[in-house]
From Swiss-Prot:
PROSITE patterns in alphabetical order: ATPASE_ALPHA_BETA (PS00152)
CDD domains: ATP-synt_F1_beta_C, ATP-synt_F1_beta_N, F1-ATPase_beta_CD
Keywords: ATP synthesis, ATP-binding, CF(1), Chloroplast, Hydrogen ion transport, Ion transport, Membrane, Nucleotide-binding, Plastid, Thylakoid, Translocase, Transport
Family matches, as PANTHER family: ATP SYNTHASE, ATP SYNTHASE SUBUNIT BETA, MITOCHONDRIAL
Reactions catalysed: ATP + H2O + 4 H(+)(in) = ADP + phosphate + 5 H(+)(out)
Membrane topology summary: Peripheral membrane protein
Pfam families reported for this sequence: ATP-synt_ab (PF00006), ATP-synt_ab_N (PF02874), ATP-synt_VA_C (PF22919)
Protein name, as recorded: ATP synthase subunit beta, chloroplastic
Keyword Aminoacyl-tRNA synthetase: no
Length: 498
């Protein structure tokens, strides 16, 4: 792979001698291009098709070389629609991989996969660009410090804490709240952490991308008055884009994050919504290139593609990238090859449960399925670890007793088990929390709960001090003091009704 200098945009240095080819075949988003003998472009080189279609409209399509076919032909995947392209059209080899703008100029702006701004706010300074294909940092450059990344979300901080500079996966089926949780994390972290973030919208709904942009402007994460003061860069390759764009948009976002880490030596947050769509786009491209499908119809190169992206998301001695990735789980099946391959790369997994969402408990994080490598006494401390383990034990016991309750009813349980069930139901409700980004839906103001407050609250429930309070007092509150205040209000209301 040839890498162009960091301070040139694709094709600038090589367009003088113009290595030209011609389109010989078009199959949807895949083009076959013939080049003169001895002038074949490298794999991953960007090719540009310029010209006019049959009605005189200007065409400008960028493609990426994927295969060398022999007979001086290459197969390339288009990064935008191929409407209007015809056989015989001229194709320019830029001599370098796709390069995108990086650095402070990207903050507050929305880009497509090619690094072109799509927010109608004028051009972006492209003096500093970087190729989207790079190798992962060497072992010797990696940083191995362990520290907790506080999110202000009770269930996450207590039971599956995130690692600073780690990789976190949000697993869930359709409609259980992955994107809302990501938006809340962006909101909380931008306020409390103050670092820069890069958001990669990979194959998700355009409406959600627009909502996120509007919310970021409202909350000040994107500063409209002074765009350079913004804290986030957005890169979108949404559902309506061709598979080539959806497959590469994650790399575009990652390249921007790597610059902040390596050159600016900052701690960066990289949000990817949704990593499953990256796999899905790779599967589409693989089929279009004629590769034999593997398990469940996925591409045979699934592990390689996932590894090449994930291994670049890491912390070095210069700075860190903490990555939070939403992972769509097809048909709620965690053994599907796409989520199963993703699991191997993660430091923490937050699993969203349809059962909890159906009960109205949001965030619908499953306390028993969610895991973290950080939940160890030597990292989080004895108090945190003990509290988390007791919460899990109580929840597990409640889960075991549910069958008995369904058949025989609560009255058939022993006194001890009834107490466990009562506390587990309080814990289940106290794990819910009103979100800032969901205020418009719930009508409840959002709450940020510090880790110490979270631990104190669960210790009080487990100790039995709050056994006398009704369980609905613990639903959608912030810290434990709000729950006791809510219980008093409920008592007053019930007396007034009588």
């Amino acid at each position: 792979m040839r890498i162009n200098p960091t301070t040139s945009s694709p094709g600038v240095s090589t367009l003088e001698e113009k290595n030209l080819g011609r389109i010989v075949q078009i199959i949807g988003p895949v083009l076959d291009v013939a080049f003169p003998p001895g002038k074949m472009p490298n794999i991953y080189n960007a090719l540009v098709v310029k010209g006019r279609d049959t009605v005189g409209q200007q065409i400008n399509v960028t493609c990426e070389v994927q295969q060398l076919l022999g007979n001086n032909r290459v197969r390339a995947v288009a990064m935008s629609a191929t409407d209007g392209l015809m056989r015989g059209m001229e194709v320019i080899d830029t001599g370098a991989p796709l390069s995108v703008p990086v650095g402070g100029a990207t903050l507050g702006r929305i880009f497509n996969v090619l690094g072109e701004p799509v927010d109608n706010l004028g051009p972006v300074d492209t003096r500093t660009t970087s190729p989207i294909h790079r190798s992962a940092p060497a072992f010797i450059q990696l940083d191995t410090k362990l520290s907790i990344f506080e999110t202000g979300i009770k269930v996450v901080d207590l039971l599956a804490p995130y690692r600073r500079g780690g990789k976190i996966g949000l697993f869930g089926g359709a409609g259980v709240g992955k994107t809302v949780l990501i938006m809340e994390l962006i909101n909380n972290i931008a306020k409390a952490h103050g670092g820069v973030s890069v958001f990669g919208g990979v194959g998700e709904r355009t409406r959600e991308g627009n909502d996120l942009y509007m919310e970021m402007k409202e909350s000040g994460v994107i500063n409209e008055q002074n765009i350079a003061e913004s804290k986030v860069a957005l890169v979108y390759g949404q559902m309506n884009e061709p598979p080539g764009a959806r497959m590469r948009v994650g790399l575009t976002a990652l390249t921007m994050a790597e610059y902040f880490r390596d050159v600016n030596e900052q701690d960066v947050l990289l949000f990817i919504d949704n990593i499953f769509r990256f796999v899905q786009a790779g599967s589409e491209v693989s089929a279009l290139l004629g590769r034999m499908p593997s398990a469940v119809g996925y591409q045979p190169t699934l592990s390689t593609e996932m590894g090449s992206l994930q291994e670049r998301i890491t912390s070095t001695k210069e700075g860190s990238i903490t990555s939070i990735q939403a992972v769509y789980v097809p048909a709620d099946d965690l053994t599907d090859p796409a989520p199963a391959t993703t699991f191997a790369h993660l430091d923490a997994t937050t699993v969203l449960s349809r059962g909890l969402a159906a009960k109205g408990i949001y965030p619908a994080v499953d306390p028993l399925d969610s895991t973290s490598t950080m939940l160890q006494p030597r990292i989080v401390g004895e108090e945190h670890y003990e509290t988390a383990q007791r919460v899990k034990q109580t929840s597990q016991r409640y889960k075991e007793l549910q069958d008995i309750i369904a058949i025989l009813g609560l009255d058939e349980l022993s006194e001890e088990d009834r107490l466990t069930v009562a506390r587990a139901r309080k814990i289940e409700r106290f794990l819910s929390q009103p979100f800032f980004v969901a205020e418009v839906f719930t009508g409840s103001p959002g709450k940020y709960v510090g880790l110490a407050e979270t631990i104190r609250g669960f210790q009080l429930i487990l100790s039995g001090e709050l056994d006398g309070l009704p369980e609905q007092a613990f639903y959608l509150v912030g810290n434990i003091d709000e729950a006791t205040a809510k219980a008093m209000n409920l008592e007053v209301e019930s007396k007034l009704k009588k």
